Amino acid sequence: MAEISAKMVQELREKTGAGMMDCKKALTEAGGDLAKAEEVLRKKGLSAAAKKTGRAATEGAVASYIHMGGKIGVLVEVNCETDFVARTEGFQGLVKEIAMQIAAASPRWVRREEVPADVVAKELEIAKAQAREQKKPEAILEKIATGKVEKFYSEFCLMEQAWVKDDKKKIQDVLTDAVAKIGENIQIRRFARFVLGEGLEKKQENLAEEVAKAAGLQK
């Protein structure tokens, strides 16, 4: 087991706002891994960010992002607790990052709870059919299908998508970091994504790649 140093405890405490003993216990449970320890605290509701998420967030901003050339447009509503925070550079920057994420990664829903039950059922059905085609044993079909649905969530639910600027983080992590830094509950409420000519027959182009280039993520 990794040795838990005072420096590690202090670092986790500064990042989460949790108590010293809670930080030490979380680090021990996580085997000295800071990221996992932070997750342990969040699950137990002991981090400052976790506590803030229960507070009402009725202020915020509705922001837009138009991709270069006008081929993709995004509207997103992000809520916070006060008008003061809504006007800060940090919050405005976060909202812009989220809008660009939506433009680049094409999510369909904010969180998995919003995915219609019939859509989930259809994905499970397709996953099982594919597994049978691959001659997988019936006993493990459910497990395989569940794994496929989890992947579906990570592709199409905004909060579970990998961040386009750092694929080691999910959007949920980006939001949690922002809550801890800004000091208020922050929630992504809803969004709309528009693609020029969507549904019409046209030449196929990689729009996600173009957005990434516009954001300076590709050369």
From Swiss-Prot:
SUPFAM superfamilies: Elongation factor Ts (EF-Ts), dimerisation domain, UBA-like. CDD domains: UBA_EF-Ts. It is found in: Cytoplasm. One of its GO terms (cellular component) is cytoplasm. Pfam families: EF_TS (PF00889). Keywords: Cytoplasm, Elongation factor, Protein biosynthesis. Associates with the EF-Tu.GDP complex and induces the exchange of GDP to GTP. It remains bound to the aminoacyl-tRNA.EF-Tu.GTP complex up to the GTP hydrolysis stage on the ribosome. PANTHER family: ELONGATION FACTOR TS (PTHR11741), ELONGATION FACTOR TS, MITOCHONDRIAL (PTHR11741:SF0). This is Elongation factor Ts. It comes from Anaeromyxobacter sp. (strain K).
